[in-house]
Swiss-Prot record:
Keyword Cell wall biogenesis/degradation listed: yes
Lineage top rank: taxon: Bacteria
Its EC number(s): 4.2.2.n1
Record region (LT domain): 270-515
Catalytically driven reaction(s): Exolytic cleavage of the (1->4)-beta-glycosidic linkage between N-acetylmuramic acid (MurNAc) and N-acetylglucosamine (GlcNAc) residues in peptidoglycan, from either the reducing or the non-reducing ends of the peptidoglycan chains, with concomitant formation of a 1,6-anhydrobond in the MurNAc residue
Biological processes annotated in GO: cell wall macromolecule catabolic process; cell wall organization; peptidoglycan catabolic process
Name of this chain's protein: Membrane-bound lytic murein transglycosylase F
Length: 515
């Protein structure tokens, strides 16, 4: 997947270019007969979306997602409440606009020439490519020339239909596909993963998130180049909503909150490793259940799944792990660190985890208060890996190179420079393996995403299995077997660790109260 990047320059230029055109309607708060006035009179911003880990998800009453956070901030900016409506596919989203049931569509929708003929786009905030996917171990098509409708299904309203039609007319006359009116993109990706469908097409971000939980999903080829993602509203002569959106995006671009959200949701999607992800998920099944009670016991304000991800990065959950430099145990503590924490046996799982948490908390306490709460953990983990003094150097270097020392996105880009003489020779604490600290934190974030997503899916499967069992009360649990009922062995565990904690936002250190 190509590097995802918010189009800050585009937002700035578009704001300047359109401000003049929209100027008559910019004082939207003072008029009573425009779209913004209607939203404020109603007291709510109506946003339609599609449920996905990136756009919007609701787990046990907690909401998260890039589009959800942006929409929540925009509603607050307008002084109204946010009303979210979830639809199953893209066609239903645009139906909401056509029928006047939504003010905005915020669902990772791609900007294209056909859509803007009928709908008003907002600023673009990241970009994706459309990719053809297949299951690892199955035939990988290298071209669309021989792909047909018996193999390829896509979701209704998918933007790629126009691209496929153009390719059919210009390059691949035998290309054909089926639009599945009953399934959205996420459902079709699941069909490919299960082997019930050969191919589907999805955007690169959705695919990268699915791969963290389903490494068997593979990209066959890019169908399109990078395409900008935007929100959509109704197209008419009332430009007040467009003007408000432009002003809002310009504001969050300038104050840095847009960059923080990019880092939070899009800053760790590159460099998928099939073998590493598969190995990790196998360890989740085979090793984690024995260690989970300890992670939960000592995690305190740290999400236990984040703590588990840290430990896996350190030792692959091997209590006896030892490095050539002498660090040992689940949290790979040095002898001096262990002694300072009062530990007597670094290879004892409980001592190692409790000591590692205290050491991380010590690093957290040193991170300047100017660093946003949800990013403090990444600074602390980098310091945990390479030493806090070198983190100070990284922040100083970020300032010298005109970055924001309180932004993890900015600081992490400078970490590899700490091993280059032209930079470390001018820093207070000298040489550091900053590239290792960079990889260390990025790997932890990827493991955390995989773990949270995997456990969420396990919980969903278990809930579906329980519901199915309730629908057939005459059949006793003993009559189920793993061939005919694949989740029976999972359900037979009376107190599965996988279900002992409800899933929540995987991208933050602490859960936030819902507004």
């Amino acid at each position: 997947m190509k590097k995802l990047k918010i189009n800050y320059l585009f937002i700035g230029i578009l704001t300047l270019l359109l401000a003049a055109a929209l100027w008559p309607s910019i004082p939207w708060f003072g008029k009573a007969d425009n779209r913004i006035a209607a939203i404020q009179s109603r007291g709510e911003l109506r946003v339609s979306t599609i449920e996905s880990p990136l756009t919007y998800a609701r787990i046990n009453g907690k909401k998260y997602g890039l589009d959800y956070e942006l929409a929540q901030q925009f509603a607050s900016y307008l002084g109204v409440k946010l009303k979210i409506t979830v639809r199953q596919n893209i066609s239903q989203l645009f139906d909401d606009l056509d029928n006047g049931n939504a003010d905005l569509l915020a669902a990772g929708l791609v900007y294209n020439s056909e859509r803007v003929k009928n709908y008003q786009p907002g600023p673009t905030y990241y970009s994706v490519s459309q990719q053809l996917v297949y299951r690892v171990g199955q035939y990988r098509p290298r071209t669309l020339a021989t792909v047909n409708e018996s193999q390829l299904s896509i979701a209704p309203g998918h933007v790629v239909v126009n691209d496929l039609q153009a390719l059919k007319e210009t390059k691949f006359p035998d290309l054909s596909w089926k639009v599945d009116d009953k399934k959205g993109t996420a459902a079709l990706l699941s069909e490919v993963i299960s082997g019930n469908l050969d191919y589907t097409i999805a955007d690169s971000v959705a695919i990268s998130l699915f791969q963290r939980v389903h490494p068997e999903l593979a990209v066959a080829l890019d169908v399109t180049d990078e395409q900008p993602v935007t929100w959509f509203s109704q197209l008419d002569d009332d430009n007040t909503l467009s003007a408000a959106l432009l002003d809002f995006f310009n504001t969050i671009n300038e104050d840095g909150s847009l960059a923080r959200m990019e880092e939070k949701y899009l800053g760790h999607g590159d460099d998928f490793d099939y073998v590493d992800t598969r190995t990790f998920l196998r360890a989740v099944d085979g090793v984690l259940p024995d260690l989970q009670p300890l992670f939960e016991k000592y995690a305190q304000e740290i999400d236990w799944r984040l703590l588990a991800a840290i430990s896996y990065q350190e030792s692959h959950w091997d209590p006896l792990a030892t490095s050539p430099t002498g660090v040992r145990g689940l949290m790979m503590l040095t002898k001096n660190t262990a002694q300072s924490l009062g530990l007597t046996d670094r290879t004892d799982a409980e001592q190692s985890i409790s000591g590692g948490v205290r050491y991380i908390q010590d690093m957290m306490g040193k991170v300047p208060e100017t660093v946003p709460e949800e990013e403090r953990i990444w600074f602390a983990l980098a310091a945990y890996n390479m030493g806090y003094a070198h983190m100070l150097d990284a922040r100083a270097l970020t300032v010298k190179t005109r970055g924001n020392p309180d932004s993890w996105a900015d600081v992490k880009q400078r970490l590899p420079l700490l091993s280059q003489k032209q930079y470390y020779s001018k820093l207070t604490y000298g040489y550091a393996r900053g590239h290792e600290a960079y990889a260390y934190v990025e790997n932890i974030r990827k493991y955390q995403i995989s773990l949270v997503g995997y456990l969420q899916e396990k919980e969903k499967q278990a809930a579906e299995a329980i519901k199915l069992a309730q629908d057939y009360p005459a059949v006793s649990p003993a009559e189920f077997d793993t061939e005919t009922f694949p989740f029976s062995s999972f359900l037979s565990q009376p107190s599965s660790n996988y279900l002992s904690h409800s899933p929540s936002l995987p991208f933050s250190l602490k859960k936030k109260d819902e507004n």
